Swiss-Prot record:
Cell location: Cell inner membrane
Official protein name in the record: UPF0060 membrane protein Ava_2216
Keywords, in A-Z order: Cell inner membrane, Cell membrane, Membrane, Transmembrane, Transmembrane helix
Organism: Trichormus variabilis (strain ATCC 29413 / PCC 7937)
Membrane association type: Multi-pass membrane protein
Any single GO CC term annotated in Swiss-Prot or TrEMBL for this entry: plasma membrane
Family: Belongs to the UPF0060 family.
């Protein structure tokens, strides 16, 4: 799970820096830094001990939950009950995908 969180922070953080530069008129240096961080996002999931499809499917759930949290903590947009419920549902899906017993 640590690698999923790290990948999520790279993807969301890098994307956010690009967003700030292109949508909010901040320095283009932020976009450049964001692109580098997005490149790290592409590498981090390779550290997962499972195959590509499972790793990215599970990561998608972590991304959703982290995005809600990022919006709350960074953008100061308080999630409503449906945002929170959806975040918990996708995290439950992550646990099923990654840790369900397989034979």
């Amino acid at each position: 799970m640590l690698f999923f969180v790290l990948a999520g922070l790279c993807e969301i953080g890098g994307g956010y820096l690009v967003w700030l530069a292109l949508r909010e008129g901040k320095s283009l240096w932020l976009a450049l830094i964001g692109v580098v961080i997005l490149g790290l996002y592409g590498a981090v999931p390779t550290l997962q001990p499972t195959h590509f499809g499972r790793a990215y499917a599970a990561y998608g759930g972590v991304f959703v939950a982290l995005s809600v949290l990022w919006g709350w903590l960074v953008d100061r947009i308080r999630p409503d009950k449906f945002d929170l419920l959806g975040g918990w549902i996708v995290l439950l899906g992550v646990l099923v995908i990654m840790y369900a017993p397989r034979g």
